[in-house]
């Protein structure tokens, strides 16, 4: 999966998030830092480069607003917008993962060669802290992260409450995008070093940037925004099959 981020004066003109070798992505930053913009960019990239046969989506939208525009897409396997349905969706994702491993065992192959399944969780901390969902959500997300890679199952988790994400969960996310954080400690929790707290504030400075964490350290990128009319065009294309034929 390729995310086209511009690196101002940096060494990269394009950010390539390798979801094959680093299958899970954690996006973290304070309120208004650009998490929704980042997720929209990822989903836009997937919708523009893959078909529903190649990419399946499970969307967990506890705010009931950030991901609702996508729920009618043919790519979407399941959409959940509260705690109980979120747990059902995570459990279904795990069952799909286990079924894929059973299929690989029957066919004597080591890597699943079917569609990619992306489990996108908006405000993952809510699931991991609420008493009604905490224990089961932690168990399911951790298990998905541990075994998802070989089955082409990917978890994309977003949060503004970085310290509340257990270390046992965080350590499974090798792919990380750090947006502006409240303080240096939050920056260290997401990208192992301070710096994200000093990123421009998109609300007051009208400029959004992020750090993408690489094996050699964090790299600074501009955060692109998919225009509303462009996203509407892509959503319209996939939700009106007749227009695809035309």
Model-assigned labels for residue ranges:
Residues 246:
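Phosphate-handling catalytic cores of nucleic-acid transaction enzymes
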Residues 1-185, 191-193, 198-202, 211-216, ...:
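P-loop NTPase catalytic phosphate-binding loop
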